[in-house]
From Swiss-Prot:
Complex formation: Disulfide-linked heterodimer composed of the catalytic light subunit SLC7A13 and the heavy subunit SLC3A1.
Highest taxon of the lineage: Eukaryota
Subcellular location: Apical cell membrane
Membrane protein topology class: Multi-pass membrane protein
Species this protein is from: Rattus norvegicus
Name of the protein described by the UniProt record: Solute carrier family 7 member 13
Spans through the membrane: 15-35, 48-68, 90-110, 130-150, 166-186, 209-229, 243-263, 290-310, 339-359, 361-381, 397-417, 424-444
Listed GO CC annotations: apical plasma membrane
This protein's UniProt keywords: Amino-acid transport, Antiport, Cell membrane, Disulfide bond, Membrane, Transmembrane, Transmembrane helix, Transport
Physiological role: Associates with SLC3A1/rBAT to form a functional heterodimeric complex that transports anionic and neutral amino acids across the apical plasma membrane of renal epithelium. Preferentially mediates exchange transport, but can also operate via facilitated diffusion. May act as a major transporter for L-cystine in late proximal tubules, ensuring its reabsorption from the luminal fluid in exchange for cytosolic L-glutamate or L-aspartate.
Stored Pfam families: AA_permease_2
Chief place where the protein resides: membrane
InterPro entries (UniProt xref): AA/rel_permease1, AminoAcid_Transporter
UniProt keyword Isomerase, yes or no: no
Length: 479
C-alpha cells in the first residue's frame, strides 16, 4: 500500500469510553482468577469469611492507586502519560530510568504471557503428561507474532478483538458465578453451612493477613494502564474517570462471585490442593466441559497479550519522540501505528521465549515498578506544592496518595527483609547500568552515522514516516 502524502500521520484521539473500559477490564483480569485464587485463602488461615473480606479490601486499595494514576493521566493527557509526568517532576534522567526498566521487563512480560497462553492452549492435546517444550515455544512465538501483526494494523483492528475477548472472559466468569449462586440456593446443606460458618475458622495472624492482602492486591494490578493510552482517548478528563468507575466495581463483583462459587462447590482444603481451581470446579459441576477450561484461559491470556504489546510499543514510541531512543522508533505506518516499536518489542519478546532462563532473571525486576509508584505519589505531591496553578481537571483525595505509597513501599521492603536474595543486588546494579547508555547517547547526544542511513533504508522498506508532530500536539492541546 502506497502512503498518501496528503494524509496526516500521527497518533489520533479515536478511543472512547467503551474501548477504554474494555482495555481496563482486560488488563486487570488475567489467568489468576481461573487458575489459582488460593493464595488469599491460604494466608487467611482457610478462614472463608476473612478471605472474602480481604478481596473487598484489596478492591478498595486498587481503587485508591488507580485514582492516583488517574490524576496523572488527566493532568498530562498524553500517550504514556507517566513518562511525561516523571520527566516534568524529576528530570529526563529519572524518566529514562523508567524507560530503561520497561525496555527489559516489557519483553519478559510478553514472553511470560505467550508461554502461559501456549501452555494452556496445547495442554488438552497431552492429557496424560506435560506438553513438550518445543511445541509450546513454537506456539508461543506464533501467538506473539500474530498479536504483533494485529497491533501494527492500528487500534481500529484491535477494537473488535478486545470486545470479543472481553465478552468471552466475562461470559466465562459470569457462568461460574451464576452457577455457584444457583448451587448455593439449591445445593446441599454442607455448602450452605460452610458459608454460614464462614468466620468460625482460626483468625490469621497479622503477618499472614498482610501477605493475603498482597496476594489479592496483585490480582487487581493493571488499573493504571490507561496512562499508556491517555493520548489516544477522546476527552480523557471525562473518559478516564468513567472507565475506572465502571471497570473496577465490575471486576470486584465478578471476583467476589467467582470466589463464592469456588467455595460453594469446593471445600477450603480441596481449593488449596488444586493447581487449577477453575478446572477442578468444572470437573465437579459439569465434567463434560472440563476440556474447554484450558481454551478459555488461553482466550483470556490472548487479550492480555494484545494489550501488553500495545502498551510496550507506546512506551518506545514516546521515548523516541523525546530523544531517548533512536528516531526510528517514533515512525508510524499508514495505520498510525508505531510499527518499528511493535517490531522491536515483539522481537525482544521472541528472544526471551527462546531463552526462558532470562525470564526468571527479568522477574526480579518487577518489584522495581513499586518504586515507580512511590515516586509517582511523591511527584504528585511535589507538583501540587510547586505548581499549585497547574490545570488539574481532577485531583485525587490526598489520603489515597499516602495509602498507595505505603502499600507500594511495603511491596519493595517486605521481599528484601523477608527473603533477601543476591538477585536483588543484580537488579540494583542493572538499574544504575542505565547510566552507561544515558551519559554518552542522550546527555552528550552521541550520533551514529550508520544508524541514520539505516533509518532512511527502513523507512523506505516498511513504508513508514516520522509523525506529523504539529497535528499530534494540536490533538493533545484540544484535550
Amino acid at each position: 500500500m502506497a502512503m498518501d502524502i496528503e494524509k496526516k500521520i500521527y497518533l489520533k484521539r479515536q478511543l472512547g469510553y467503551f474501548w477504554g473500559t474494555n482495555f481496563l477490564i482486560i488488563n486487570i483480569i488475567g489467568a489468576g482468577i481461573f487458575v489459582s485464587p488460593k493464595g488469599v485463602l491460604q494466608y487467611s488461615s482457610m478462614n472463608v469469611g476473612v478471605s472474602l473480606c480481604v478481596w473487598v479490601f484489596c478492591a478498595v486499595l486498587s481503587m485508591t492507586s488507580t485514582l492516583c494514576a488517574a490524576e496523572i493521566g488527566i493532568t498530562f493527557p498524553y500517550t504514556v502519560a507517566h513518562y511525561y509526568f516523571l520527566k516534568r517532576c524529576f528530570g529526563p534522567f529519572v524518566a529514562f530510568l523508567r524507560l530503561w526498566t520497561s525496555l527489559f521487563t516489557g519483553p519478559g512480560v510478553l514472553a511470560s504471557q505467550a508461554l502461559l497462553l501456549a501452555e494452556y492452549g496445547i495442554q488438552p492435546f497431552y492429557p496424560s503428561c506435560s506438553a513438550p517444550a518445543v511445541p509450546k515455544k513454537c506456539l508461543a512465538l506464533a501467538m506473539l507474532w500474530i498479536v504483533g501483526i494485529l497491533n501494527s494494523r492500528g487500534v481500529k483492528e484491535l477494537s473488535w478483538l478486545q470486545t470479543v475477548s472481553m465478552v468471552l472472559k466475562m461470559g466465562i466468569l459470569s457462568f461460574i458465578s451464576l452457577s455457584g449462586l444457583f448451587l448455593l440456593v439449591t445445593g446441599r446443606k454442607e455448602n450452605v453451612r460452610r458459608l454460614q460458618n464462614a468466620f468460625d475458622a482460626e483468625f490469621p495472624e497479622v503477618s499472614r493477613l498482610i501477605e493475603a492482602i498482597f496476594q489479592g492486591y496483585f490480582a487487581f494490578s493493571g488499573g493504571g494502564s490507561f496512562t499508556y493510552v491517555a493520548g489516544e482517548l477522546k476527552e480523557p478528563s471525562k473518559t478516564i474517570p468513567r472507565c475506572i468507575f465502571t471497570a473496577l466495581p465490575l471486576v470486584t463483583v465478578v471476583y467476589l462471585l467467582a470466589n463464592l462459587s469456588y467455595l460453594t462447590v469446593l471445600s477450603p482444603q480441596e481449593l488449596l490442593s488444586s493447581d487449577a481451581v477453575a478446572l477442578t470446579w468444572t470437573d465437579r459441576v459439569i465434567p463434560q466441559l472440563t476440556w474447554s477450561v484450558p481454551f478459555a484461559i488461553s482466550a483470556s491470556l490472548f487479550s492480555n497479550l494484545v494489550t501488553s504489546v500495545f502498551e510496550t510499543s507506546r512506551t518506545s514510541y514516546i521515548a523516541s519522540r523525546n530523544g531517548q531512543l533512536p528516531l526510528l522508533c517514533s515512525t508510524l505506518n499508514v495505520h498510525s501505528s508505531p510499527f518499528i516499536a511493535v517490531l522491536l518489542d515483539v522481537s525482544m519478546g521472541s528472544i526471551a521465549i527462546v531463552l526462558t532462563n532470562l525470564i526468571e532473571l527479568i522477574n526480579y525486576l518487577f518489584f522495581v515498578f513499586s518504586i515507580w509508584t512511590v515516586l509517582s505519589v511523591i511527584g504528585i505531591l511535589k507538583l501540587r506544592y510547586q505548581e499549585p496553578n497547574l490545570h488539574r481537571p481532577y485531583k485525587v483525595f490526598s489520603p489515597f496518595l499516602f495509602i498507595t505509597a505505603a502499600i507500594s513501599l511495603s511491596m519493595v521492603l517486605i521481599p528484601l527483609i523477608k527473603s533477601p536474595k543476591m538477585q536483588y543486588i543484580y537488579v540494583f546494579l542493572f538499574f544504575l547500568g542505565g547510566l552507561l547508555f544515558y551519559v554518552p547517547l542522550i546527555h552528550f547526544k552521541l550520533k551514529l552515522i550508520w544508524f541514520q542511513k539505516l533509518t532512511c533504508y527502513l523507512q523506505l522498506l516498511f513504508n513508514i514516516c516520522i509523525p506529523d508532530v504539529s497535528d499530534e500536539h494540536v490533538a493533545e492541546e484540544e484535550s
